[in-house]
UniProtKB/Swiss-Prot annotation:
GO biological process, one term: translation
Pfam families in alphabetical order: RimK, Rimk_N
Sequence intervals crossing the membrane: none
Designated gene of the protein: rimK
UniProt xrefs under Gene3D superfamilies: 3.40.50.20, ATP-grasp fold, A domain, ATP-grasp fold, B domain
GO CC, any one term: cytoplasm
Gene Ontology MF terms: ATP binding; metal ion binding; ribosomal S6-glutamic acid ligase activity
InterPro entries linked: ATP-grasp (IPR011761), ATP-grasp_RimK-type (IPR013651), ATP_grasp_subdomain_1 (IPR013815), RimK (IPR023533), Rimk_N (IPR041107), Rp_bS6_RimK/Lys_biosynth_LsyX (IPR004666)
Cofactor(s) the protein requires to work: Mg(2+); Mn(2+)
Sites where the protein binds Mn(2+) 2: E260, N262
Positions that bind ATP: K141, E178, Y179, D187, R211, S212, N213
Protein name, as recorded: Probable alpha-L-glutamate ligase
Binding residues for Mg(2+) 1: D248, E260
Length: 301
């Protein structure tokens, strides 16, 4: 197969591993920087150009699109879909999962466990927003934040009011969520491929920190998940429409709660913690499922 890997750099761990896995299995793979690709939006003959040449003959496209380039990256991916190239994750699923509020609304509609969450822009009554999610301590999140950036734990009522007022002052849209104290600063990353959890790890926040993101100094170790956690992760990925996803869960007193569904999960942490060849599993999934023209939306999303 001829595979297009949408990535800003072939030197990134996840990109490097996918290239290795594809080439080991005899596939041709080309790394394409989405920001350097440009498109011809023409009726009946959509095309993508890169470095002065038209991109042709691809069977599969693997999107590794960073959050900061979601809009343009999804546009390039959508163009591939319109050309009949099979996407590992479809553009509509990626944009859906990147919208934190939309994701939570979809998950709640299907009855997936989640922390009690409020959404606000300029609430008239901040105290009522805080009361709505059960009071302090609580977590305030920027809607557009990633890797733990823009996430604040407010431990008291006064702190919560100050944080919310501060975000409002810079005209930021925020999520206000209950703090799952019983999780003890740990979350579970479930790696889902093709409707199955193929690996899972526990990420633990360092002392004095509540965010367990590896980018923030958290540690990771392999963990055995429960059947309910497995089912929740698979369902969350399916609701988002993602073939490959990193589903982040917390263990709460009322069962597993989904914190985020990541459409472009990193491979370094999960491969290091579990010792599994996740990149190889992704390529194997593509070999079984990646048929030209087999795109549910054909770029209509």
């Amino acid at each position: 197969m001829k595979i297009a890997l949408l990535s800003r750099s072939r030197k990134l761990y996840s990109s490097r591993r996918l290239i290795e896995a594809a080439e080991e299995r005899g596939h041709e793979i080309q790394v394409i920087d989405v920001l350097r690709a440009y498109m011809n939006i023409t009726s009946h003959k959509p095309s993508i150009h890169y470095k002065g040449e038209e991109l042709e003959g691809f069977d599969v496209v693997i999107p590794r699109i960073g959050a900061s380039v979601t809009f343009y990256g999804a546009s390039v991916l959508r163009q591939f879909e319109m050309m009949g190239v099979y996407p590992l994750n479809e553009s509509v699923a990626i944009t859906r999962s990147r919208d934190k509020l939309r994701s939570l609304q979809l998950l709640s509609r299907k009855g997936i466990g989640m922390p009690v969450t409020g959404y606000a822009s300029k609430p008239d009554d901040i105290k009522d927003v805080i009361k709505m999610v059960g009071g302090a301590p609580l977590v305030v999140k920027l809607l557009e934040g990633t890797q733990g950036i823009g996430v604040v734990l407010a431990e008291t009522q006064k702190a919560a009011e100050s944080v919310i007022e501060g975000f409002m002052g810079v005209k930021a849209n925020i999520l206000v969520q209950e703090y799952i104290k019983e999780a003890n600063g740990a979350d579970i990353r479930c790696f889902v491929i093709g409707g199955k959890v193929v690996a899972s790890m526990k990420r633990q926040a360092p002392n004095g920190e509540f965010r367990s993101n590896l980018h923030r100094g958290g540690s990771a170790e392999v963990i055995r998940i429960t059947p309910e956690e497995r089912s929740t992760a698979v369902s969350a990925a399916k609701i988002m429409g993602l073939n490959v996803a990193g589903v982040d869960l917390l263990r709460s007193n009322h069962g597993p709660v989904v914190m985020e569904v990541n459409s472009s999960p990193g491979l370094r942490g999960i491969e290091t913690a579990t010792g599994k060849d996740i990149a190889g599993m992704i390529i194997e999934y593509i070999e079984k499922s990646g048929k030209v023209g087999k795109t549910k939306t054909r770029g209509k999303g």
